[in-house]
Each structure stands twice: as C-alpha cells, then as structure tokens.
Amino acid sequence: MRGALAGLSLATLATASPVLVNSIHNDAAPIISASNAKEIADNYMIKFKDHVTQNLAAEHHGWVQDLHEKTQVAKTELRKRSQSPMVDDIFNGLKHTYNIAGGLMGYAGHFDEDVIEQIRRHPDVELVERDQEVHVLGSESEVEKNAPWGLARISHRDSLSFGTFNKYLYTEDGGEGVDVYVVDTGTNVDHVDFEGRASWGKTIPQGDADEDGNGHGTHCSGTVAGKKYGVAKKAHVKAVKVLRSNGSGSMSDVVKGVEYAAESHLEQVSITKKGKRKGFKGSTANMSLGGGKSPILDKAVNAAVDAGIHFAVAAGNDNADSCNYSPAAAENAVTVGASTLADERAYFSNYGKCNDIFAPGLNIQSTWIGSKYAVNTISGTSMASPHVAGLLAYLLSLQPAKDSAFAVADISPKKLKANLISIATVGALTDVPSNTANILAWNGGGESNYSAIVEKGGYKATHRPTMLEEIESEAKVASKKVYSEGDELAHKVAELTEKVEDLIAGELKDMFRELKRE
C-alpha cells in the first residue's frame, strides 16, 4: 500500500509540473527528468535520504565508485571475448559529492544504465535526477546608454522623470563588509570598476580557465558592486564559475558551485568568530542562470540560504510561470522578475506566485570583458537579479559588523527577504498578471539607518508622468505650438500672395493696354 501511495503522489506531481518521474519498480528511487530542459546523456544527480550521515555518505561514495569501475572492467572484458567492435561508451563515474550545510547530501556522476539501476535500489538513495544543461538568462546586446537607469529606479519611489533619471540615492559605504558570491560565468576581476574588491573564488567546470570568457558574470558582478554601475559600491565580489564561455553548463556543476558558496560563507563566519577577520557583516549570492525544473538545485539553494547566505535568483526569460524553472522555484531565495524604464513588466520576464519582487532588467549597462574598462548594455532577468543581490548586500552592510561592540543578532535570510518585500513599492508596474506580486525593489532612498528604512514600510505607487510620458507631453505641446505658429504664418503668406497676385494682375493689365495703343 505504501508503494502504491508513493507511486500515486509522484504521478500527480508529473502531471502538475514540468518534472517527469519514471515509473517506480521494486521500491527503487524515482528518476526525475525536466520536460522543459535538454538532458546531458548518462549524467545524473543523486540525493540521499535524510538519515544519511557524513560517514554513511563516504561509504556510499566508495561503494558507487567501486561498482562503476567493476562494471566498466566487466563490460570491456565481455566485449573483448565476443569480439564485438569497440564503441565509445566510456563512463567517468563519480563527478561531484555534495554536502551543503547538511541541508542537501548527495553526489553526481556519469554512469551507465546498470550502475544507475543499482544506485536506485540502494536504501540510502531518495531520488535520482537526470543532469541537464543550464544557461545564462540574458538577451541580445542593446545600444549603450550614458547612465545606469536601474540604479536610479531602485532609489526612487515614483516613476523616473527628467529630474531623477540620472540620480542614484545611496549610502556611500553600502555593501562594506559583505561578500557577494556571483555564481555564473566568472568575473573580470581586474576591471577598474571593482577597485580591487573582486577576487576569484572557484572554477567548477573541469579543465576550464579561471576567467570570464563570456561577459555575463562580469555584467552581473558590476551591477552588484561596481563603483559606477553597482548597487552596493563597497561589497566584495567572489567569482564562482559554473558555466563555460558559451554561457551554458551542467546542473550538477551549478549545484557544486552553490555548495562552494555555502562552505566559503561558513568559513568566513568561523574565522570572524576567531577574530581573524574584522568587519565581516555577512554574505549574499546571485544566480542569473536557469534551466528546467530541478528539485536538487532548488534544494541546494534552500540549504545554502539555511546556512546563512542571502540568495537572489533570476525568474527567467520565457514569459512563463517561473515556478516551472530552477532555481527560480527555490522558495527560500528571492526570485526576481524584470521591469522596464517605462515601469512595465519586461515582455520576456517570467511571472507567477514564485516571483517575489521586480527590479530593472531592460537595457542595463554594466561592466564587461575584453579590457579593464569595457562596458556593455544587455537585457534579461539576469540583469534584474543582481540589482536585488546588491540590495541585499547594501541592507546587510547597514548593520554593525559581527565583531563590533555594537553587534546585534544576525538578520536571517528569511527576515531580510521579508523586510525587502515589506519596504518595496507596491503597484508600480503595468502588465503584471494577477497571480504575481506587483512590487518593485527599493533601497531606502539614501537612508543609512536600516531600522528607519524598515519602519517606513511599503509605498503605494501613485501615477505620475514617466519620463517617456513627459517626452510625449512636451512633444504634443511643441507640436501644437508649431501648428499654431504655422497656421498664422500660412495666413500671412496667403495675404501676401494675394497682394502679389493683385499687383501682378494690375501690372499685366497696364502692359496689355500699352500694347494695344502701339
């Protein structure tokens, strides 16, 4: 009966979401696939059951690698005996092991079908998920603008106007003492806009270089913490490369990157308690990437948040329900949709109940690769999410340092997320579906006291002319003026023409009279 009920609940899940679950047989763990993603053949992520300890996990890892190697040897020997042609079916075995602050334990690897079937039947295994491709969430480059309007927008309550378009209201030390893990394609750490505050954390894809060969991660990092382009201008960026230079990678590598960020954060907490780091105030993270629904990635992000990292993730660029994508569906993170200069939901932005907040994401200028001065303007929820990751760092920095005599209890990610939402601007955007929170991120408008910002609470947007509406209004006034002046001029021209015609007619009459006399 227990197995039948489990099968029923999983079947229901498969029909209600883009996650497909293979049929369960002999009490084997299910294999989960994302129907809206491209799978990586014969690559899997495995999640342990909650009872598994570190020692049990280590024993299991040894067992699975031994099983893999014996299976490979046996198949090779069988092929030799049968004189079958050699085929390229070499499997690499164990790739990653996971332990994200005890909240997610498991591993990933490249296994053949026989091995994965035995893994499924192991009593320590809860589920098996097919690995899938993950990609950045940006769109094509746009013409560069002279100023980052997104910064101005998150520091003003009402729609931007000519008077506020280039004005970013902020606290000078915003972000100081906070580490921001940008889990992406890497970061151009030598860019001048980082002022030496960016460093390389870890490269996850095997054999890849410690550099951003794509630009996407650098752009996100600049929006988080750049001197000119960043929300939190004193934060420290930690580059975590999980995607290759083409902007894509594997879900299993992304999970490993999340684990690195969590472990690194906990290490900083530990050395701060030992007095080896001064002024540390906490960590945030940004993931402007996505793929199909992945319960393991969502679990990884939730575990990292439980470990103390304040996570911002992009909602996605498919103009669809963000709950069908990961990590957008991770409930502990802050899921961010994209808005436009005209205070609209960006046409590409995902929506739905998994969205927590909106931030600027169309035509965003920030740092780039190619030189230490390079900039680029691109669009996507990838550009919206780092506004919020930077804002989380900004708000964290307004607290006393953990080693300060004035230190207070840490603001948990859950509490800061709730505060971020509570102070946001309500009803600012148009074209937001009814099942989606219509709130726009706000940084406090330059206020440096965190409690004072929170006490201000939310703000109901009032419709004031946007900058585009101002342009349209002034154009209409100018048009009317031109029309009025043109009408007056035309009348004068008509009068003059009539006088000229009368004069010419008179002259012609006189000329004909003279001709008749001759």
Curated annotation (Swiss-Prot):
UniProt-annotated catalytic positions: 184, 216, 382
Sites annotated Important for catalytic activity: 317
All residue ranges annotated as the Peptidase S8 domain in the record: 148-454
Enzyme class: hydrolase
An annotated GO BP: proteolysis
Residue ranges occupied by any Inhibitor I9 domain in the UniProt entry: 44-136
Keyword Coiled coil carried by entry: no
A GO term, aspect molecular function: serine-type endopeptidase activity
Annotated glycosylation sites: 246, 286, 449
Keyword field: Allergen, Glycoprotein, Hydrolase, IgE-binding protein, Protease, Serine protease, Signal, Zymogen
Record propeptide residues: 17-138, 460-518
Leader sequence residues: 1-16
SUPFAM superfamilies recorded: Subtilisin-like
Region (IgE-binding): 244-298
PROSITE patterns in UniProt: SUBTILASE, SUBTILASE_HIS, SUBTILASE_SER
Classification via InterPro entries: PCSK9_ProteinaseK-like, Peptidase_S8/S53_dom, Peptidase_S8/S53_dom_sf, Peptidase_S8_His-AS, Peptidase_S8_Ser-AS, Peptidase_S8_subtilisin-like, Peptidase_S8_subtilisin-rel, S8pro/Inhibitor_I9
Enzyme Commission designation: 3.4.21.-
Pfam families per UniProt: Inhibitor_I9, Peptidase_S8
Similarity remark: Belongs to the peptidase S8 family.
PANTHER family: CEREVISIN-RELATED (PTHR43806:SF11), PEPTIDASE S8 (PTHR43806)
Function: Serine protease.
Name of the featured protein: Subtilisin-like serine protease Cla h 9.0101
Organism per entry: Davidiella tassiana (Mycosphaerella tassiana)
